[in-house]
Amino acid sequence: MSLCTLEINLSAIKANYRLLKNICENSVDFLHNVANKEEFAGNTSPRTAAYTLVREDASLGSTPKLPLGASYAKNLLVGAAVKANSYGLGAIEISKTLLEENCRYFFVASSNEGISLRKAIGDEVNILILNGVFEHDALELIEYNLIPVLNNLNQIKIWQKFSNLKNQLLPCYLHFNTGINRLGLNHNEIEQLINNRDLLKGLNVEYIISHLSASEDSDNPYNLEQLNKFKAYLEYFPNAKASLANSGGIFLGKDYHFNLVRPGAALYGLNPLGSNKPNPMQNPVTLKAPIIHLQNLTYGSRIGYNMTFTTKRDSLIATLPFGYADGFSRNFSNQGTVFINSRNVPIIGRISMDLVNIDVTDLPPSDIFLGQEVEIIGNNCTPDKIADIIGTIGYEILTSLGNRYKRIYT
């Protein structure tokens, strides 16, 4: 059994979900409210600009425009991105928790993630496969009632092929690329769908979605550019519902919400507003490790692989039982920090596969003993904060959390 414990506070995740739902359901202009508080004063500007139709070329102009559907503000739903095992925290446990909050839309990356989730939480929810459908897994998607997000014409053809094979209308989402340029139907493919609706024959397009590239940066004009492009495309698909906002998109304002929002990072305590603004979310993650070894070293002692740290005084060094095999980046060598009783303690020497050394010389003797718990991740050192130390993001910190930690759900 692992000596290190990873505690996931499900109540905090519930609270985060409720906050996001409240912002959406009540059209709370969170950024405006924050900007007007003295302690958060700054140059925050919510995106409330009027919708402007954007076209990439004149060819769409020859196609008759159709009116947009019913008001998006009505019946707005809050789903959850639980891909990558809920960012390393446990998709099954967290999905069951969100079910208690009436969440019914769960987004995963692949069919195997979707199948595992379906087996665990039953048939009452919608499970969306963001990477879409492929020849090898189409029958499994049908068997387990998983809905693919179709990202290109080839995936549409595959799903249509199996619709014909099964002689049934198959549900799907369409992903329109509005500028992030990863997955998603491109402009030419969307134009083909507009001009030839037979390309979607046999398919029930439930939602049209897109994905924001810089939603955590509320001042980035690219957000509005993507929004306008998305709305322009939606005019030609009046019967489909729409989804655009991820965690950061929720905070950009109601214009970005449409029918369904898809938070992920914010549920798990990561800051949806970027590193330069206060985090409105609760941190649900605590990683602790015990001191398993203590040694007094004299001035000039060298520590760890390749002797990258040399003591500059007589020092008391503690060793902790985790390392890069547990997803704790080697980049924290000689620059990471941990906490003992809310006191900052430096990491020294190279991060090893299974071990980390820390310098506890300056701590009170009463705080230093074998078995003493050390906070690696927690309220003193959130995933976002420790990510900043090595120039990465909190997402990577969470998704790297290894399987050797004993996970405890509270």
UniProtKB/Swiss-Prot annotation:
Substrate binds at residues 182, 353. PANTHER family: ALANINE RACEMASE, ALANINE RACEMASE, CATABOLIC-RELATED. It is an enzyme of class 5 (isomerase). InterPro entries: Ala_racemase, Ala_racemase/Decarboxylase_C, Ala_racemase_C, Ala_racemase_N, PLP-binding_barrel, RPE1. Coiled coil: none annotated. Belongs to the alanine racemase family. Catalyzes the interconversion of L-alanine and D-alanine. May also act on other amino acids. It catalyses: L-alanine = D-alanine. NCBIfam families: alr, PRK00053.2-3, RPE1. This is Alanine racemase. It comes from the Bacteria. Keywords: Isomerase, Pyridoxal phosphate. GO terms for cellular component: cytosol. Its cofactor is pyridoxal 5'-phosphate.
